[in-house]
Amino acid sequence: MKNEIQDGLGSALILVAKNHGIDIRLLDQAIEIERCKDPENGDFASNIALKYAKVFKMKPRQLADELVVSVPLMDSVAGMEVAGPGFINIRLSRESITAVLENVVAKKERYGCFENPNARKILVEFVSANPTGPLHVGHGRGAAYGDSLSRLLIANGHQVDREYYINDFGRQMDILALSVYWRYVQECGIGVALPKGIYQGDYVIDIAKKLKEKEGKRLAYPVNEWAPDYPQTWTQEQVDNGDRDRWIDGAIAGLKEKLGQKEYRGVFDLALSMELDDIRGDLEEFGVFFDRWFSERSMSENDMINNALKKVDEAGYLYEKDGAVWFKSTAFGDEKDRVVRRKNGMTTYFSSDISYHFDKYNRGYDQMIDILGADHHGYMARVRASLAALGLDPEKLVIALVQFAVLYKGGEKMQMSTRSGEFVTLRDLREHVGADAARFFYVMRKPEQHLDFDLDLAESNSKDNPFYYVEYAHARCCGMLNKAEEEGYEFSPEAALKCRNALVEPEETALISELHRYPEVVIAAGKQMAPHQVIIYLKELATRWHHYYDVGHKVLHEDEEIRNARLLLTWAVRQVLRNALAIIGVQARERM
């Protein structure tokens, strides 16, 4: 319908241009129409006359008058009128207004989903938290956003793969293995106090107990046989000057030497597998499923990192300085060059990033979306620079930054830290407010905006809680349809379509207009990678429905035509609420 109106205005514009001797090649601006905020003004409005008044050398109202009389007849349009300085207000016919109900009935859960002739193959990588501990509430926001965005892109007709990048190769995983082994020797009765700076949480003890269950005490060696002496506490100066980190690296090296490669890998792999299982289960209970779990270690084992660096070198963008190998990222606009291989010959995290994104391109994706924490703000320039150095199109890579969420309970901020063990996990949050409420609140704001997550609000059963307010609207629809069945009224949405033009109340027209808007919201939100727009829409539709319900329009009316029409409207509102909630991965409640 919107396209039909735009085409009609376009035809009128060309006709008026020819009448005035205007070169139609000057008519190069898009014809925009927007929904009227005030229904008294009509259904749609266009500023086309204001945009082209100078080209036609006419006053906007004069041009608008000529355009209105030149628009071809359209069944969907009841009339057009000029308003204000030259806006064209458009009123739809009653038949076209209520036709959306036929569309909702025909498509049901597919209403708001599209077949896209320009569909792209898209890879969305998100969460990708180090498997060094349980997911915390900060990771939860990235999970909710990434999964909702994936669902939104699928609704827009794209082929989407979800991917989790496993950081299973590097120092942080070695620190986890060290932490687990330290707890293991404690479990075996020969350990000493756990030093600061390694992982402290109870989950480390769980892995250590599993290690003891599997190996007994055969791998337990006193700490003084493999770890250098350390102070009971680290001073801030020792932390700042790197003494603590050097001690940790020394302890890791000593443990590897003491256990040998095979036994150390066994400790490492046990810690990795248990943490990955925990993360995978946590995410699945949160409604997030990945198509692929991509291992960083697999790139090293398959020599993918060295091969990618070789290609960058062959392109002339690597050089040696101070014993290290550097990438000339400044040649592509980055603020400084980046180390890809340290003095000790080890590759850096950035080298893995280069290899990983090179592999993504080789898999044939049209677009790759990386969803990262806001602390990765400097990441985009260096990765895009590496892609350009490899002769690849850096514009295919989109990086979305997500601010971490901060939890509040009783007005007080809650803290979280993985190493110290004093963190609020995603599992804690799910058990506290439920997965659906958590996802709703996570996606409610733009991802780049700071999010204060009010636990008290998320748990409240009041209209101030947007999650409850939207779910209650769906439950009210279900309640009304159930009541109709209980009272013996026969209702079928397909059969009730013939009654749809009985929906003449202003509140009914407003609700139908909201249903019309839903596909437009899905398209706009998809283009902008903005699932929060779906929640804005949900709140607006819920508000319209609650108002309609509260003003007292009797759905189970004595008049059969009115009753069936209103039940049809109720059914359609329920369906669209359900569809929109599905975009953000939230179950629609039938009872509150």
UniProtKB/Swiss-Prot annotation:
Keywords tagged on the record: Aminoacyl-tRNA synthetase, ATP-binding, Cytoplasm, Ligase, Nucleotide-binding, Protein biosynthesis
Entry's localization field: Cytoplasm
Position of sequence motif 'HIGH' region: 129-139
Main location class: cytoplasm
Enzyme class: ligase
InterPro entries: aa-tRNA-synth_I_CS (IPR001412), Arg-tRNA-ligase (IPR001278), Arg-tRNA-synth_N (IPR005148), Arg-tRNA-synth_N_sf (IPR036695), ArgRS_core (IPR035684), DALR_anticod-bd (IPR008909), Rossmann-like_a/b/a_fold (IPR014729), tRNAsynth_Ia_anticodon-bd (IPR009080)
The enzyme's E.C. designation: 6.1.1.19
GO MF, any single term: ATP binding
A single cellular component GO annotation: cytoplasm
Matches recorded under NCBIfam families: argS
HAMAP family, per database record: Arg_tRNA_synth
Subunit-level organization: Monomer.
Name of the protein: Arginine--tRNA ligase
Gene: argS
